[in-house]
Structures are given as structure tokens and as C-alpha cells.
Amino acid sequence: MLPAVVAGELLMKILVLADVESKYLWDYFEKEKLEGIDLILSAGDLKPQYLSFLASFSKVPVLYVHGNHDDCYDIQPPDGCIDIENKIYVYKGVRIMGLGGSIRYKKGKNQYTQKEMNHRINKMWLSIKKNRGFDILLTHSPAAGIGDGPDEPHKGFEGFNYLLEKYKPKYFIHGHIHRSYQIKFKQEYEYNENTKIINGYERYIFEYPDV
């Protein structure tokens, strides 16, 4: 299949996944459903077998960050997939920065205080500088006060607000907030003139201007 062209620009079609394994893709899988997909991004809390399954049937990279329920990744990481935690992965010129995990609300892995997440962000400084910023921020949790929840486990990270304001990525992609948690649930919306936000709950496809 030829890549899509809009107004003279090549577009990269990206499949985003998070939180719930899609029956459409897993239980009722047909290889044709992945046709035209150029990249797969997982925002966390998905079974490793699910990601491995999709990786085995697609010929594109499957990038992922950890959700707060992904402790099993330490023992059984998704086969054929690429962990981009605390990294910037460049694919076809698109710079994708990964920071998984949720706010700390109990004992366990992949949970962080605001201070701990800020420390992780600070450690990314050299990589951000080397890559001259990033185009997509891929996380599990949302930013503070932007599509997050009122309860402690679903609060967003303040450090993500800083990243959006300072580096102005084209897309901020997260999970963690399920469709049932919000009356006015939106999967894609504009944060400002620079950045669109996508909640990748279950599955979502968007097109990124290819460079």
C-alpha cells in the first residue's frame, strides 16, 4: 500500500494503544487491519503477549513505555518490541520521547512522586539537547490538570506540563485515564497551537506529517 499523501505531504499513520487490549485487534484479528500502519505506540498497561502478537504480524516498530500495572515487563518484556523508557527514539526523522509510570499511590514499581518524575526528566536533558527536542512525548500518565483524574492514583505529572511548555512537541500521547472515568472523554484534542493531546485508551489511529 502506498503512503497517504495530503496537500503534497507524505503522512505517517500511527496506531496508539493503551490500558485495554482491543478485541477488534486481538480476539477478532485480521492481518488487513494493520495495513497502512507505519508505527505502533503503546502508552502502557497492556499484556506483553498482546504487544508481541501485534509485533509478529506487523512489519513496523512497536514502541512502548511502562504503565503502573506493567511489573511483568521486567520478567517477560514484549517480544519484538522496543522499550523507550527514558529515551528518545528516532524513526523516519520523528523524535519520540518515552516516560512511563504513574503517580505514586501505593507500594510498587512504575510509580513515582512528582519529585521523582522531575528527576527522571532532568536526566533526559542531555538526550533532549542532542536531539534538539522531541516531536512526540509518549507517557502513561497525563499531565497535571490536563485530562487527568480527581483522585490520587490518576493525577497527572507537573513535569509533563513543563515539557509541553518548554519543548512544544507536536503530540503528547498518554494512557491511564479510561473512557469510563470521564463523562466528556476525548481521545484527541488541541492543547495549544503547538501540541495535540491523544489519550490512547484501547486503540486510536492518527496521521503524523512524515519528514
Feature locations, PLM:
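N-terminal active-site segment of His-dependent metallophosphoesterases
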Residues: 2-57, 127-133
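Active-site neighborhood of phospho(di)ester-bond hydrolases with catalytic His/Asp-centered motifs
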Residues: 16-18, 39-45, 63-68, 84, ...
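Conserved catalytic scaffold of divalent metal-dependent phosphoesterases
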Residues: 16-24, 66-155
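Binuclear metal-dependent phosphoesterase catalytic core
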Residues: 17, 26, 88-92, 163-167, ...
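Active-site environment of divalent metal-dependent phosphoester hydrolases
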Residues: 21-25, 46-52, 68-74, 104-108, ...
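A generic local structural motif
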Residues: 25-31, 49-52, 82-84, 122-126, ...
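Short, structured coil segments at secondary-structure junctions
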Residues: 57-58, 78-79, 193
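A short, gly/pro- and small-residue-rich
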Residues: 58-68, 157-160
